[in-house]
């Protein structure tokens, strides 16, 4: 192949490499690990630790095996609430060993008929894996298409980054779901509480016009959040 004909391929390869690097949810680590020191209010020690995108690093000389261990997913969380669900999140804030590693994991417990309400993760793609029970998982694309699947034990569903989605227990027994993310802090935007429970509030007129409903309905919805 001539030098002239290979030039476009080199340019394309370079462009793809740059694009791939920009699509990574979290920055690539530049060290083996950076166990998080999660800053607390007035914590001068945390402020003195070396910083990296995410949380400050615990001094390597003080890192121990337990920093890379998390037992929280082994225990079911309380689902006795109006939605019938609860989440145990293992992210860089709750599981310091994940800091800078670009991954996190969680456990969703759903009572019969319980729902993990509509929400999105602005910084991560999500894998939904059902450990027990039967769960309807679904998301809506930017084109307004609704994609969903009823998952049984051992089955998995993927939700693209930023898409609004949910998990709903359609079985007659409690369900357990493991969720995995390609970000140490995926973030969560809950649709209901964001729109109707923000502080300060979104004006009723804006919401009523946006949803084409009476302001009384907006006030009713706000009373729920």
UniProtKB/Swiss-Prot annotation:
Mn(2+) binds at residues 119, 121, 126, 165. The keyword Signal applies. Residues 1-25 form the signal peptide. Glycans are attached at residue 86. Disulfide bonds join 34-57. Oligomer (believed to be a pentamer but probably hexamer). PANTHER family: GERMIN-LIKE PROTEIN SUBFAMILY 3 MEMBER 3. This is Germin-like protein 3-8. The lineage of its organism: Eukaryota, Viridiplantae, Streptophyta, Embryophyta, Tracheophyta.
